[in-house]
């Protein structure tokens, strides 16, 4: 623009219109300067842009070549990894079949050992019975021997008593003979005394008559009354004398007869008692001999039975020792084979883990390259490549503690949730959209031999499994379940319920329509449903109140934003691939694998 000429004359006052035009000219000058500066800046930026476009084209060529090489390498590595995975799966199936066979053989060996142990227990019980019978027989024999000795002592005493009784009997016979002789003698003496008495009586009567005659001669002169009195007194005195004499003879005879009869009765009674004692002693001696013979036969039979039982026990012990040695050798061989199988599986798992790590590194590198290319295409406003959509899937495995053979296999597939963004490169305006999805995370923990094998999302049943080789008592145990933030519900087992080794039990809700069939199928009649939902917590609580197994699931939502640009599509999937990990490996606690 042309500048104003200098004013030669004196300064004149400027009008407001003049002043406004001068200000507008000054503003236009400044704007022209700014426009020229902006044009220079635009030209410099265009030159820089051309230079950057040239560099970008060069980078694209280099990147295309590198991506093609990496893609070829990745595809070959992926094919090798898939081949190794297929071989690993086949090898794992073969090893599982072999492990099943080994476990079946081990179970048969255990059953055989249990059977042998049962036979040994029965034989030991029989031996104990025979030993107790033998000891009882020995005790009875000792008792019989002591009884025999006592009986022999009694027999000796009875024989002594019998000898004494026989001696007494002989003495009694002799005494009886003496008494008989004495009786005869006494009878003779009595007869003699009677004869003497009769003679004395006759003599006495003769004397009385003589005395009476003398008195008659003397008392011729006595008064007749006095004579009668004298006769009466004389007759009375004679009568008294006669009665006294008869009484003495009678008393002597009675006493003699009583003494003789008493001695005779005593002798007969003593003889009868001696005969009875001797007969009883003979009978007892006969019975004792019979009992001794019977006990001797029983003792001989028991000794034969004990000898046969000892021989059988010895044979059973030898057979059991042989079976134990055979079973121990088989068990050692099986354990060695299982150790080799575990080592082989561990080696394959290590190789598989290395392949997964390599695959994860390749996935991350390819993802980084693609993000870099998409950023350059977006900045340079180039058309996106046909493969602008990226899909990332994660496979996670939850480790659960179990007491099996030593391997823990993740089971069950979670539900798949996706986050997708559509390609909006053809739209003239830049739009902002939000896409939402959900994620389901599950966790299973078991500290004992019984774990929670399966929980129905619809709340129809809960299944428990005994993964050990021993029976587990679940008396008064409870299954507690809580859905979201609701109240706890608990199912309580009966006091005598036992879960067999390797078996499962399913507790159905009453609304599921299942049939109550213990011990594998139980129906909770007071509860129509366990509570449906994908976010829950189920716990197995022992009778002491300790949680021995827990299975929890949490359902969460995720969001992704798209601002007129093409972003990633993320696919979260639990159990996308079956990942087999050695139990106790710390790497299996929480590990993810990204797959193209």
From Swiss-Prot:
Modified sites of kind Phosphothreonine: 12
Region spans: Coil 1A: 27-61
Sites bearing Omega-N-methylarginine, chain numbering: 413
InterPro entries: IF_conserved, IF_rod_dom, Lamin_tail_dom, Lamin_tail_dom_sf
Propiece residues: 594-596
Sequence segments annotated as region (Coil 1B): 74-207
Domain IF rod: 24-380
Lipidation (S-farnesyl cysteine): 593
Protein family membership: Belongs to the intermediate filament family.
Name of the protein described by the UniProt record: Lamin-B2
Annotated gene: Lmnb2
């Amino acid at each position: 623009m042309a500048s104003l000429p200098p004013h030669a004359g004196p300064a004149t006052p400027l009008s407001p219109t003049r002043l406004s035009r001068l200000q507008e000219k000054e503003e236009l000058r400044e704007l022209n300067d700014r426009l020229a500066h902006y044009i220079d800046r635009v030209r410099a930026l265009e030159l820089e842009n051309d230079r950057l476009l040239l560099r970008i084209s060069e980078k694209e060529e280099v990147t295309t070549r590198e991506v093609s090489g990496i893609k070829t390498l990745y595809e070959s590595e992926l094919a090798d990894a898939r081949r190794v995975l297929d071989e690993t799966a086949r090898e794992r199936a073969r090893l599982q079949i072999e492990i099943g066979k080994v476990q079946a053989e081990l179970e048969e060996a255990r059953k055989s050992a249990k059977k042998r142990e049962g036979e040994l227990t029965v034989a030991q019980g029989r031996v104990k019975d025979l030993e107790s019978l033998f000891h009882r027989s020995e005790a009875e024999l000792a008792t019989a021997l002591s009884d025999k000795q006592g009986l022999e002592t009694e027999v000796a005493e009875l024989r002594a008593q019998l000898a004494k009784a026989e001696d007494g009997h002989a003495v009694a016979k002799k005494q009886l003979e003496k008494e008989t002789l004495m009786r005869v003698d006494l009878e003779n003496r009595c007869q003699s005394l009677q004869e003497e008495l009769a003679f004395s009586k006759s003599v006495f009567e003769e004397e009385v008559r003589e005395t009476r005659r003398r008195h008659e001669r003397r008392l011729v002169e006595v008064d007749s009354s006095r004579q009668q009195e004298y006769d009466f007194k004389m007759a009375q005195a004679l009568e008294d004398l006669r009665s006294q004499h008869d009484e003495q003879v009678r008393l002597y005879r009675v006493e003699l007869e009583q003494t003789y009869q008493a001695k005779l009765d005593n002798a007969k009674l003593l003889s009868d008692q001696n005969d009875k004692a001797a007969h009883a002693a003979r009978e007892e001696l006969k019975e004792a001999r019979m009992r001794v013979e019977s006990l001797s036969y029983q003792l001989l039979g028991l000794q034969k039975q004990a000898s046969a039982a000892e021989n059988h026990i010895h044979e059973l012990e030898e057979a059991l020792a042989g079976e134990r040695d055979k079973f121990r050798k088989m068990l050692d061989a099986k354990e060695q084979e299982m150790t080799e199988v575990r080592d082989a599986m561990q080696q394959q798992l290590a190789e598989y883990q290395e392949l997964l790590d390599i695959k994860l590194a390749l996935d991350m590198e390819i993802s980084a390259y693609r993000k870099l290319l998409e950023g350059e295409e977006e900045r340079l406003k180039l058309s996106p490549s046909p493969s602008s959509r990226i899909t990332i899937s994660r496979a996670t495995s939850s480790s659960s503690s179990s007491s099996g053979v030593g391997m823990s296999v993740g089971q069950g597939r979670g539900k798949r949730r996706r986050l997708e963004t559509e390609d909006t490169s053809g739209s003239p305006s830049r739009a902002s959209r939000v896409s939402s999805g959900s994620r389901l995370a599950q966790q299973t923990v078991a500290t004992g031999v019984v774990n929670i094998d399966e929980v129905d999302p619809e709340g129809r049943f809960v299944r428990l499994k005994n993964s050990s080789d021993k029976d587990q008592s679940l008396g008064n145990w409870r299954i507690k379940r809580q859905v979201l933030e609701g109240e706890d519900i608990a199912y309580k087992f009966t006091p005598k319920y036992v879960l067999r080794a390797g078996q499962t039990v399913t507790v159905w809700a009453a609304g599921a329509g299942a049939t109550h069939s213990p011990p594998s199928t139980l129906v909770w009649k007071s509860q129509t449903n366990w509570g449906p939902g994908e976010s829950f917590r189920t716990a197995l609580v022992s009778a002491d109140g300790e949680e021995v197994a827990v299975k929890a699931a949490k359902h969460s939502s995720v969001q992704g934003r798209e601002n007129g640009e093409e972003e990633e599509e993320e696919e979260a999937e639990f159990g996308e691939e079956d990942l087999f990990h050695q139990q106790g490996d710390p790497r299996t606690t929480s590990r993810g694998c990204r797959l193209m």
